[in-house]
Regions:
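Bacterial N-terminal signal peptides
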Residues: 12-22
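Sec/Tat signal peptide C-region and signal peptidase I cleavage site
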Residues: 23-28
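A short, solvent-exposed beta-strand micro-motif common in secreted/extracellular proteins
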Residues: 85-94
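Acidic, glycine-anchored loop motifs typical of Ca2+
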Residues: 94-103
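Short Pro-Gly-centered beta-turn/loop motif in secreted/extracellular proteins
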Residues: 71-86
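Bacterial N-terminal signal peptides that target proteins for export
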Residues: 2-13
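Extracellular beta-sheet/turn segments enriched in Thr/Pro/Gly and aliphatic residues
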Residues: 110-147
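A short, amphipathic beta-strand motif
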Residues: 31-39
């Protein structure tokens, strides 16, 4: 009788674990990014997604990087199954096609770029809180590139 109770308890815990594993979906299967304001249709567009303020502030280690080279998909880029709820997006068009965001010697951007939620930049730096959004609350994000 004791082994039946022990086995039954293990089965119950395993079942509860599986239920919690499959019920809590922490990804977006419906988020679409529309990019506007790009310079020419022959240069790829890159989307970098950040989930941590530290990595965004240090310009390193994005959670994901999506590159879109197909001219027909420039306006609609699907972001599916990324594992975090709160993200901030940085988008740029790679005019010189070297795969990196190019800046001049002063650190000013040489390529069109934009952020999720399109914050007004003025003369201050963009912080993570200005671009972060909940992936479950949006179905479509439109990002305007600054030239």
């Amino acid at each position: 009788m004791h082994s039946f109770e022990a086995n039954f308890t293990k089965i119950i815990f395993f079942t509860i674990f599986l239920v919690f594993l499959f019920i809590n979906h922490s990804f977006s299967d419906h988020l679409t990014v529309k990019v506007t304001g790009f310079k020419d249709a022959s240069s790829p567009i890159y989307i970098w997604g950040y989930d941590r303020k530290f990595y965004f502030d240090n310009d390193s280690a994005p959670l994901f990087m999506v590159g879109e080279r197909d001219i027909n998909n420039f306006n609609q880029i699907n972001l599916k199954a990324f594992p975090h709820l709160i993200v901030g997006l940085f988008v740029f068009q790679d005019i010189d096609q070297n795969g990196i965001f190019s800046k001049n010697f002063k650190g000013d951007p040489l390529e069109p770029y934009g952020f999720s939620l399109n914050p007004v930049q003025g003369y201050q730096e963009i912080v993570f809180e200005d671009i972060a959004f909940d992936m479950n609350k949006f179905e479509k994000i439109e990002i305007n590139l600054n030239n």
